[in-house]
């Protein structure tokens, strides 16, 4: 009988099937926002906070020892609260509408034998400031994908490498990835998917875990802006988040997660074209301040 490796290591954090969370930052500065594309004058703004609702669902479609296939959907809506947006069109749009990312994704874990496996992941997201569904078009969409080939050397160690197409840094990049989940002993372990995220894990028990690490997240968001060069700009938003996380089981398959850390501005480039990278395609760049953030979520996890 042919045997196949599983997708987990011992004492790993549980996989979330349903996730609902709230996140909030402290206040920070948003400098260098232009009055319009025709006027060189800049203005600095104070952002009192950014509050966000986050939700995710991952449903196992096929789950056998030969293959695990999941379909999912995600939502990330950020609301910027500016102290005094005034008549600046960019600041008003940012203050009055939610910066939204909503999409669908699929993940396949395919064990090849007892030692080797493949992980394939793809997602498409609609990102922008949408007042209605008609605001969503092809230039609001981003496509991300990851392919990993790996080795499971024991029930405590999985390692793999591959390549990713991602907008996590706000701008489209293709980057090699390192996947490594390892449990050192009953207390300590690590869960890495570099360069996207990485955490050192401490298990008080199998239902009570503390993690320290980071995550890089973001996307490219479209915004209609009448006074810009083309009437629409694209905000390339990337955030680097060093953080501490606490996961604990409440009852059955219901867990809570609390995290706190620093929201470091990796990128906040406002471009005149979709997937733009050149300086002459840039409307402006703002070197956002770096506030602390707090996140709380409830999660329904897999057995």
Over which residues does each language-model region extend?
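Transmembrane beta-strands of outer-membrane beta-barrel pores
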Residues: 22-28, 73-81, 124-130, 163-169, ...
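Residues that define the transmembrane beta-barrel architecture of outer-membrane proteins
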Residues: 47-53, 96-102, 137-143, 172-176, ...
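Extracellular loop and loop/strand-boundary signature of outer-membrane beta-barrel proteins
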Residues: 38-44, 88-94, 130-135, 164-166, ...
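Outer-membrane beta-barrel translocator/channel fold
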Residues: 34, 88, 195-294
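Residue-level signature of outer-membrane beta-barrel architecture
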Residues: 57-61, 108-110, 151, 182, ...
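Transmembrane beta-barrel domains of bacterial outer-membrane proteins
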Residues: 1-117, 121-134, 142-144, 295
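Outer-envelope beta-barrel architecture signal
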Residues: 12-18, 65-71, 114-120, 155-159, ...
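Outer-membrane beta-barrel "beta-signal"
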Residues: 178-182, 246, 287-303
């Amino acid at each position: 009988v042919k045997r196949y490796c599983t997708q987990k290591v011992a004492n790993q954090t549980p996989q979330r099937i349903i996730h609902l969370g709230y996140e909030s930052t402290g206040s920070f500065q948003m400098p260098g926002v232009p009055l319009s594309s025709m006027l060189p004058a800049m203005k600095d703004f104070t952002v009192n906070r950014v509050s966000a609702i986050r939700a995710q669902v991952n449903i196992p479609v096929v789950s056998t020892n030969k293959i695990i296939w999941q379909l999912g959907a995600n939502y990330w809506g950020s609301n910027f609260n500016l102290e005094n947006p005034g008549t600046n069109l960019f600041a008003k749009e940012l203050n009055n509408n939610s910066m939204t990312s909503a999409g669908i994704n699929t993940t396949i874990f395919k064990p090849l034998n007892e030692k080797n496996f493949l992980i394939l992941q793809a997602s498409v997201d609609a990102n922008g400031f949408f007042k209605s569904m008609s605001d969503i078009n092809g230039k609001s969409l981003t496509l991300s994908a990851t392919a990993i080939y790996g080795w499971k050397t024991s029930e405590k160690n999985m390692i793999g490498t591959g390549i990713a197409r991602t907008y996590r840094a706000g701008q489209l990049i293709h980057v090699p990835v390192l996947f490594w989940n390892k449990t050192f002993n009953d207390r300590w372990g690590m869960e890495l998917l570099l360069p996207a995220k990485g955490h050192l894990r401490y298990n008080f028990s199998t239902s009570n875990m503390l993690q320290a690490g980071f995550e890089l997240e973001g996307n490219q968001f479209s915004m209609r802006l009448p006074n810009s060069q083309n009437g629409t700009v694209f905000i390339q938003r990337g955030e680097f988040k060093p953080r501490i996380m606490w996961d604990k089981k409440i009852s059955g398959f219901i867990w809570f997660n609390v995290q706190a850390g620093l929201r470091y501005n990796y990128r906040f480039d406002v471009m005149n074209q979709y997937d733009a990278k050149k300086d002459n395609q840039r409307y402006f760049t703002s070197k956002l301040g770096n506030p602390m953030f707090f996140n709380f979520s409830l999660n329904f996890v897999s057995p």
